[in-house]
UniProtKB/Swiss-Prot annotation:
Organism in which the protein naturally occurs: Neisseria animalis
UniProt EC number: 2.1.3.3
Coiled-coil regions listed: none
Keyword entries, A-Z: Amino-acid biosynthesis, Arginine biosynthesis, Cytoplasm, Transferase
Catalysed reactions, semicolon-separated: carbamoyl phosphate + L-ornithine = L-citrulline + phosphate + H(+)
Compartment(s): Cytoplasm
Associated pathway: Amino-acid biosynthesis; L-arginine biosynthesis; L-arginine from L-ornithine and carbamoyl phosphate: step 1/3
Main location: cytoplasm
Biological process annotations from GO: arginine biosynthetic process via ornithine; citrulline biosynthetic process; L-arginine biosynthetic process
Entry superkingdom: Bacteria
Name of this protein: Ornithine carbamoyltransferase
Family membership: Belongs to the aspartate/ornithine carbamoyltransferase superfamily. OTCase family.
Disulfide bond sites: none
One GO CC term, this protein: cytoplasm
Gene designation: argF
């Protein structure tokens, strides 16, 4: 849109970390481009790219973090609320161990917001991530809450976030275990109403399993009787 020259290197078209080291790939691409965005799995890969590229490297998504999504989500919350960011309360409900749960917790803490995680304790962010969030909150005045009760998490919030319950690369068998753990953390009209805020808004980084109109959605309905998974 802005007239930049863009090259897309798909996984099968790059030898990064396979026949060519990440360090060498970073040095070559850094001589050819003004910036690099990496979207993949390991956080250590994007950090090594940033160490050796010599140009800005953007994290488009890793297993651990999704910072570019946070830029979009912070802007969206600001645009759709009359409050400044440090007065906004939001909750993330669902599996909070991966990039969206980690990143939203740290975003809220860094921006001085009232951020809540609602999930079974087994699916909370790691102790290291929680400690980082609490340390940031001490500096910014943020309020950080983690609870195993979905209704408690959403009480009084302005926004409710969620994400898929089974991530890319996880086996199909994971669904049964994850649904058993998270069924009470689905975002439903009842959970939205539990916020007590008639203007509460729902956010999802997408794609969402919210109905039967996909192959996975239909399989989940036939197997588990759910029309929609993390949201319905």
């Amino acid at each position: 849109d802005q007239g930049a020259g863009v090259t897309y290197l798909e996984p099968t078209g790059s030898q990064i970390g396979h026949k060519e080291s990440i360090k060498d790939t970073a040095r070559v691409l850094g001589r050819m481009y003004d910036g690099i965005e990496y979207r993949g799995f390991g956080q250590e890969i994007v950090e090594e790219l940033a160490q050796y590229a010599g140009v800005p490297v953007f994290n488009g998504l890793t297993n651990e973090f999704h910072p570019t999504q946070m830029l979009a989500d912070a802007l969206t919350m600001r645009e759709h609320s009359s409050k400044p960011l440090n007065e906004i309360a939001f909750a993330y409900v669902g599996d909070a161990r991966f990039n969206m749960g980690n990143s939203l917790l740290l975003l809220g803490a860094k921006m001085g917001m009232d951020v809540r995680i609602g999930a079974p304790k087994a699916l909370w962010p790691s102790e290291n991530i929680i400690a980082q969030a609490r340390a940031l909150a001490e500096e910014t005045g943020a309020k950080v809450t983690l609870t195993e009760n979905a209704e408690e998490a959403v009480q009084g919030v302005d926004f409710i976030h969620t994400d898929v319950w089974v991530s890319m690369g996880e086996p199909k068998e994971t669904w049964e275990e994850r649904i058993a753990l998270l069924k009470s953390f689905r975002v439903t009209p009842e959970l939205m109403a539990a916020s007590g805020n008639p203007n509460v808004k729902f956010m999802h980084c997408l794609p969402a399993f919210h109905n039967r109109e996909t192959k996975v959605g239909e399989w989940i309905y036939e197997t588990f009787g759910l029309n929609g998974v993390e949201v319905t």
